[in-house]
Amino acid sequence: MVKKVALECSECGRRNYSVPARPNHEERLELKKFCKHCGKVTVHRETR
């Protein structure tokens, strides 16, 4: 089974997306995604 990590909105702190974990990467994933709670596109960071 694939481990999943959550992507947390940098503005409101809600965890809106889950993506497969990247075991060979030390740095955390950052993507610009739409946050339905903020109503705009914000940076979402990987949480562990």
UniProtKB/Swiss-Prot annotation:
HAMAP family: Ribosomal_bL33 (MF_00294). The gene is rpmG1. Belongs to the bacterial ribosomal protein bL33 family. GO terms for biological process: translation. NCBIfam families: PRK00504.1, rpmG_bact. Keywords: Ribonucleoprotein, Ribosomal protein. It comes from Limosilactobacillus fermentum (strain NBRC 3956 / LMG 18251). This is Large ribosomal subunit protein bL33A. GO terms for cellular component: cytoplasm; ribonucleoprotein complex; ribosome.
